[in-house]
Amino acid sequence: MLTYAPVSEAGRVGKTTTAATLAASHARAGHDVLAIDMDTQNGSLTYFFGPDYDRGDPNVDNLVRHLVGRPQGEFQDLTIEVEEGIDLIPSHNMLEDLHEFLLNEKNQAENFGESYSMYHQLHRVLSEANVRDKYDVIIVDSAGKAGPI
C-alpha cells in the first residue's frame, strides 16, 4: 500500500492540488484510493471533490470522533465515494480542535497510568479499520500548520 501526505507549514503551496492529482492519477490507473481531508482551515480537498456534506454538523460521525475513541458508527461509514476508485473522508470543523482533544485523551490516559501517543491515532484508526485490505493508496491532505497528525 502506498501512502502520501503532502506536508508544508505554509498554506497555499499546492498540498491539496497534489493530493487531488495523486488520487485521480492512481484511480485512473485502477487503484482503490482513500483520500483523507485533514485540512483544519477550509477542507479544500472536500470542496474539490464536491460531495454533499455538512462539515459543520456537530452530530455527524467524523474522523475526529474516531481518533479520540468516540465513534458514532463504523469507520467505513465515514467514506464517501466521490469518483470511481476514490473514497473520501471529508474534513470536519472538529478538526480545528483535534490537538486539544488528543491532548485531553493523552492526559486522561496518563492519569490512569496508561501510555497514549497523540501522534499514532490516525495509524491506529486506519489499522483497526483494515484499510490495507480495501485500498491500494491512502492520501492525507493536511493543514498548512504543524499539528498532531
Spans of model-derived segments:
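P-loop NTP-binding core
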Residues: 1-149
